[in-house]
Amino acid sequence: MPKRILQGTVTSDKNEQTVTVLVERRFKHPLLKKTVRLSKKYRAHDPENQFKVGDVVRIEECAPISKTKRWKVVTEAVTA
């Protein structure tokens, strides 16, 4: 099964080797036919502490690293 890759914004970098990433997704509601925005926070592994608040990053699913971390930061997303 392929690993999921998501893109989001770093909202917290206060923990050692961990960042909190806010991932927002949009979809059309099946009944209301309206675009709905949902967001979810993921805790991701950042071994070098290189990402700061406000950075747009890509995170990849991985084996559990701790109680709450199941994602790792792959790269900083290119914003054009």
Swiss-Prot record:
Q: Which family does it belong to?
A: Belongs to the universal ribosomal protein uS17 family.
- GO MF annotation, one: rRNA binding
Protein name per Swiss-Prot or TrEMBL: Small ribosomal subunit protein uS17
Q: What UniProt keywords are attached to this protein's entry?
A: Ribonucleoprotein, Ribosomal protein, RNA-binding, rRNA-binding
Q: Name one GO cellular component term.
A: cytosolic small ribosomal subunit
Origin: domain of life: Bacteria
Task: Report the protein's function.
Answer: One of the primary rRNA binding proteins, it binds specifically to the 5'-end of 16S ribosomal RNA.
| Taxonomy of the source species | Bacteria, Pseudomonadati, Pseudomonadota, Alphaproteobacteria, Rhodobacterales
Biological process per Gene Ontology, one example term: translation
- Gene name? rpsQ
Q: Subunit composition?
A: Part of the 30S ribosomal subunit.
